[in-house]
From Swiss-Prot:
O-glycosylated. The gene is CSF3. Monomer. Keywords: Cytokine, Disulfide bond, Glycoprotein, Growth factor, Secreted. Disulfide bonds join C37-C43, C65-C75. It is found in: Secreted. One of its GO terms (cellular component) is extracellular space. Granulocyte/macrophage colony-stimulating factors are cytokines that act in hematopoiesis by controlling the production, differentiation, and function of 2 related white cell populations of the blood, the granulocytes and the monocytes-macrophages. This CSF induces granulocytes. Transmembrane segments: none annotated. Belongs to the IL-6 superfamily. This is Granulocyte colony-stimulating factor. One of its GO terms (molecular function) is growth factor activity. It comes from Canis lupus familiaris. Glycans are attached at T134.
């Protein structure tokens, strides 16, 4: 698919807001991971990867944001869809534990705000799809351990997602 729409730099105000929102989401995700590590000794996401596959924890694609195929419209759509997916995953973690509920709620709200910001920018550029993305099937965490392990994996995957998003948005900031 050929790149469509504007390919010039994104507004500085949008990029600064994205950077601020990314930092918030990363801090929230780190807080969730640190609490799960300290409280439940779930400290190494790499040890939980197989469980993540078994639970069906999806990871959003960011192929349009990679340096090989970077395109503004596709990347913004994938960023929005990815954040929307993480909203659903975070909702699926509800009930993880009483002490983590406030952190999870904050992470969910900050992720939602970031997704809304991306959507508004797509609308401003005339690039918003006619139909917003759908969430798809979310994993069913059937035990407290699965929710906690899922929390570690979702937070870890979200951090990786945000790192790639950050690099892509910085590229679009260049004149």
């Amino acid at each position: 698919m050929a790149p469509l729409g504007p390919t010039g730099p994104l507004p500085q105000s949008f990029l600064l807001k994205c950077l601020e929102q990314m930092r918030k989401v990363q801090a929230d995700g780190t807080a969730l991971q640190e609490t799960l590590c300290a409280t439940h000794q779930l400290c190494h996401p790499e040890e939980l990867v197989l469980l993540g596959h078994a639970l069906g924890i999806p990871q959003p694609p960011l192929s349009s944001c990679s340096s090989q195929a970077l395109q503004l419209m596709g990347c913004l759509r994938q960023l929005h869809s990815g954040l929307f997916l993480y909203q659903g995953l975070l909702q699926a973690l509800a009930g993880i534990s009483p002490e983590l509920a406030p952190t999870l709620d904050t992470l969910q709200l900050d992720t939602t705000d970031f997704a809304i910001n991306i959507w508004q920018q797509m609308e401003d550029l005339g690039m918003a799809p006619a139909v917003p993305p759908t969430q798809g099937t979310m994993p069913a965490f059937t035990s407290a351990f699965q929710r906690r392990a899922g929390g570690v994996l979702v937070a870890s995957n979200l951090q990786s997602f945000l790192e790639l998003a950050y690099r892509a948005l910085r590229h679009f900031a260049k004149p």
